[in-house]
């Protein structure tokens, strides 16, 4: 590919990321499609199931320990699938632009998996990941979907980020 064309593509991708960040700051969330290629999604799923299937009785423990489908145990955030996802170039680029820095430190607190044969009734789990006493934008959480998520999914409340400080002030966290 011609280097001029390649530079234009990089510039266009950069501008698109900036547009998504503008939407994030306005609405409190944004959906960015195609952050991972199909090949990267397949690799991440392969690595996840390799880890998941390596732990005896994990499904039984998981269904008992967490009613929301979130894996928080067995060092999930340090497994190969977690590192694979967080080191993808597009993900890194998004967070570089979001925080306006080249120096990133990231965490991966868990992952969500609910098998198709799960019969548990879903319950809302409304919460915020930003600490109650923090003001302004101090926490951005990414969610990388490896499936279509047409049965269960993440729920976000548009512009709820604008109520964070006021809500916790009323709860006397400040």
Model-derived features: positions:
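Double-stranded beta-helix
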Residues: 149-174
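Short, conserved beta-strand element in jelly-roll/cupin
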Residues: 132-150
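A structural signal for short, well-ordered beta-strand segments and their strand-loop junctions
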Residues: 31-33, 105-108, 145, 153-156
